[in-house]
Amino acid sequence: MKKFALSLLAGLVALQASAATPDRLTIVNQYVDNVLTKAGDQYHGQSPTPLLADGIDPRTGKQMEWIFPDGRHAVLSNFSAQQNLMRVLVGLSNLSGNPSYKQRAEAIVKYHFQHYQDESGLLIWGGHRFVDLKTLQPEGPSEKEMVHELKNAYPYYDLMFSVDKEATARFIRGFWNAHVYDWKIMETSRHGKYGQKMGALWQSPFEQQPPFFATKGLSFLNAGNDLIYSASLLYKYNKEDGALVWAKRLAQQYVLPRDKATGLGVYQFTQALKRDETTDDADTHSKYGDRAQRQFGPEFGPTALEGNMMLKGRTSTIYSENALMQLQLGKDLGAEGKELLTWTTDGLKAFAKYAYNESDNTFRPMLANGKDLSNYVLPRDGYYGKKGTVIKPYPADNSFLLSYSRAYTVLPDAELWRVARGIARAQGLGELGSAAGKDVKVDLATKNNDPYALFALLDLYQASKVKDYLSLAEKVGDNIISTRYKNGFFMADPNRQYADVDTIEPYALLALEAAVRNQPQSVAPFLNGAGFTEGGYRMEDGSTRISTRDNEIFLLNVGETLKPNNKK
């Protein structure tokens, strides 16, 4: 009888705990309701638009503002920086059965097409354009000439095509038309002009150029990624064969210059055309030529080019953002995506072989030819740091765990698994196994609360159906809720002043719920995309802070203000 009473008491306690702790879908539902209420249009009375602010102070409800150098304030609403949220809204409708969230996402897309698409097809969004939620007027930092720019944004084209197929197709064509400066040699740039007259587009002639040919436009991979992704989706949804030809052609430009011995690279397939001279090493404008060559060339020779710099940040673009996007395209496009899968997995294997330090879970900073730059002291000022800066190995974080785990589900390769396994161990997740599902001993007491880790575990679970991975994902999900969900919003640090409505914690929790229900298709695949806003920002003392990014504002704790960055 005593045993029965104790058992009954334990059951009641567990039941009460369960009742007191909302399930993950309820949490995401609460969060989304808070976003739609507090980040919504509060400025237009009985006729509010469906638009949303990018950031919210959870304590006061104040919407995050951009302060221009002339002192004007604007409530920042940048649709390119809300694409993860759009995926959350659709996924929440799919899992909850409540269509209103998807309908809100559709309304936001429709509103942008109706009000913020120019004659060339481009939208008012991206790194240097946004909408002031107060006035509904397009805005942008003037020193960037209000150009169009996307970097690893990966808009939710699936939704956009479902809302307005022709407007989405117009945008993608306009995107390529504005950002490919010379189709014959594939000269691209991260900056595109609005209002451009449509050219020959997919019918343009092309002649393959040698690796690292000199151009005025800078072929950064983070900008190339969005071009590749958009044209591939245009082919998928609109059957424009030429779009896929050019998408794969652009993707290949980043493969052809890879070092022949190591297979590493590249971040750019061109180098900056030298158009002027300077004796000031600290002036890193691209008109003075390739910035890596200026800073590293005297010691390392002609291979020291920006495209060959395998440094922190650049490698995230190559082996995380690009990798996740191309792995997904490879799956979506079937036989047409086979090359994308091969290029991506080959690159990840090369990076694993030459850069990964399993002993301390770091990546070596390198040149693409394999030259290890660990602990190298910069001999002069330049693009990569001040004279005297020491280049250090950098941690292999959960974003790399995700890209290597996802690649392994496509190609079960031992080198890919070695990196995923090593990162997981270092990130407190325990032992993933000698291979997927073999000798598994995960740590179900982990304190890991990183949504990237959760996404990675879900990939491994979907590929292997090993329950241990799902159980560990649930634990990480619980940790996310207990440590990052405060005042009705998700924030990596509860002391932050503003919550970012595009944060990925609710996205990861929805993906987890979908996996538990065996409905993974209910939530869009995670691509690690993110928009941004950058430009001149007015400091409290009235000075202008050049090249301020919105993520710097999101990193401020309550009571903190931006510090000078000394950029010119």
Regions found by a protein language model. Name each.
Residues 1-2, 567:
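Generic cytosolic/nucleocytoplasmic N-terminal low-complexity/intrinsically disordered segments
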Residues 10-18:
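Hydrophobic h-region of N-terminal signal peptides that target proteins for export
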Residues 8-9, 508:
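A ubiquitous, low-specificity "background" feature that marks scattered single residues
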